[in-house]
């Protein structure tokens, strides 16, 4: 369409009518329906949604931003509001600003699907809010459109990580691109433990539900990763996200986590199934909602098709009811401090060989007893910087300094071996 019409044209003498209530809303809906009829020759009816999940809007935004020809821009709504928007696109190899048609203040239609979208601005207390409307030619078109949303969302979600964060106003949901994939070969941990974890993941996603039905096993699994920070729990999760053909969702537990946010997250995660749901810092679950969380896990369909991965740095804070029970967390794995062999493997992979000989790397691996992978990473950065600036290194001195700092900062006994109750 070259000449895109306006639903509500501005006139000075009518500006009071633009701020009215139902009268203005009824006028706008009528004009939208008339404009759709004029364009396509069929009547589009307004539908209301009782579903808090509105993924179809995400797909519309993606189509508009990508320049897809499938959604047609039918009309603007208010003449004096925005027609275009800009955003910083972090998903591109070279992030930059993009300019695209506005979703708000516009009417879009998928004529072949028989549905249309309108994000209508309204004015309240000096602010501009918006009201989302969905139109369809008939119930059959609406059902067919909604049935097609989930497969497309599932494919879209495989390319990104869906991040749920519980905040003061409820759960926010964003999709973040996997900027740097981690290969399984880059995960350094006990070989037997690594094999067992990946095998359980692969069994879940590479077999269909018939295996679970045949052996009467719930099609829902869960593992808990625990241990001191900086030892590869996050790296392991990233490698899983980049190596399975399924969506991965990430849920950050906070003090704002409530029964409402728990229900909202699981409802959204079920729509992505089969999928992985990573629950970060599960020990931070507020005490007053832990029973609700356990009941949600026990629900007949609450986790169908979901592989749960819980992570914690403080396993002693975990509710014992979570563990060793089918449908909750079936297994717990300690991701502990690396031994000398693993430290040596990490240091070789990280690139210490650029400025250290083979013998010096082996010696550094011995000296760094008690170091986490994160601390070894810090040691690499410091050593590389010194090598670049001075042409030499004093890695033994650096290790000694870091060891002293580590001893000063350590607190509590949970990091000590044989103090954790999960085996």
From Swiss-Prot:
Got any disulfides in this one, which pairs?
none
Q: Does the keyword Signal apply?
A: no
Point out the gene that encodes the protein.
yjoB
SUPFAM superfamilies membership: P-loop containing nucleoside triphosphate hydrolases
- Which residues hold ATP? 227-234
* Cellular component, GO, one term: cytoplasm
What is the purpose of this protein?
Answer: Shows ATPase activity.
Region of interest (Disordered), ranges: 403-423
CDD domains named in the record: RecA-like_protease (cd19481)
Catalytic activity, EC: 3.-.-.-
Origin organism is Bacillus subtilis (strain 168)
Enumerate the Pfam families for this protein. Answer: AAA
According to the UniProt entry, its GO molecular function terms are: ATP binding; ATP hydrolysis activity
Q: What is this protein called?
A: Uncharacterized ATPase YjoB
Keywords (A to Z) from UniProt: ATP-binding, Cytoplasm, Hydrolase, Nucleotide-binding
* Cellular compartment(s): Cytoplasm
Spell out the family assignment given in the record's similarity comment: Belongs to the AAA ATPase family.
| Induction line | Expression is sigma W-dependent. Induced by alkali stress. Strongly induced at the end of the exponential growth phase.
């Amino acid at each position: 369409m070259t000449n895109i019409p306006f639903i509500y044209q501005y006139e000075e003498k009518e500006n009071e009518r633009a701020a009215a209530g139902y009268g203005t809303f009824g006028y706008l809906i009528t004009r939208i329906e008339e404009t759709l009829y004029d364009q396509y020759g069929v009547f589009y009816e307004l539908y209301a949604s009782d579903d808090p999940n509105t993924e179809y809007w995400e797909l519309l935004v993606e189509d508009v931003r990508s320049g897809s020809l499938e959604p047609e821009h039918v009309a603007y709504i208010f003449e004096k509001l925005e027609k275009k928007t800009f955003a910083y696109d972090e998903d591109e190899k070279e992030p930059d600003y993009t300019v695209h048609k506005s979703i708000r203040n516009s009417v879009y239609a998928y004529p072949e699907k028989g549905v249309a979208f309108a994000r209508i601005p309204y004015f309240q207390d000096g602010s501009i809010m918006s009201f989302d409307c969905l139109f369809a030619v008939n119930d059959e078109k609406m059902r067919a459109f909604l049935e097609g949303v989930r497969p497309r969302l599932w494919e879209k979600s495989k390319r990104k990580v869906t991040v749920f964060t519980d905040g003061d106003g409820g759960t926010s949901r964003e999709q973040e691109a996997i900027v740097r994939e981690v290969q399984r070969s880059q995960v350094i941990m006990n070989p037997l433990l690594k094999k067992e974890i990946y095998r359980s993941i692969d069994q879940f996603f590479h077999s269909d539900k018939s295996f679970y039905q045949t052996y009467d096993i719930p099609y829902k699994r869960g593992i808990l990763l625990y241990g001191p920070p900086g030892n590869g729990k996050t790296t392991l999760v990233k490698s899983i996200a980049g190596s399975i053909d399924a969506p991965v969702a990430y849920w950050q537990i906070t003090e704002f986590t409530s029964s409402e946010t728990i229900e909202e997250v699981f409802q959204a995660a079920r729509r992505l199934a089969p999928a992985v749901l990573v629950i970060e810092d599960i020990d931070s679950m507020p005490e007053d909602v832990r029973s609700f969380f356990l009941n949600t896990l026990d629900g007949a369909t609450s986790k169908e098709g979901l592989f749960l991965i819980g992570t914690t740095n403080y396993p002693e804070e975990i509710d014992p009811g979570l563990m060793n029970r089918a449908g909750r967390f079936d297994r717990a794995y300690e991701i502990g401090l690396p031994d000398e062999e693993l430290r040596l493997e990490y240091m070789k992979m990280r690139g210490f060989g650029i400025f250290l000989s083979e013998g010096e790397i082996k010696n550094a691996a011995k000296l760094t007893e008690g170091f986490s992978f994160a601390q070894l990473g810090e040691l690499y950065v410091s050593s590389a910087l010194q090598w670049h600036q001075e042409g030499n290194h004093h890695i033994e001195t650096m290790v000694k300094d870091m060891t002293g700092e580590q001893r000063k900062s350590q607190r509590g006994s949970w990091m000590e071996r044989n103090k954790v109750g999960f085996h």
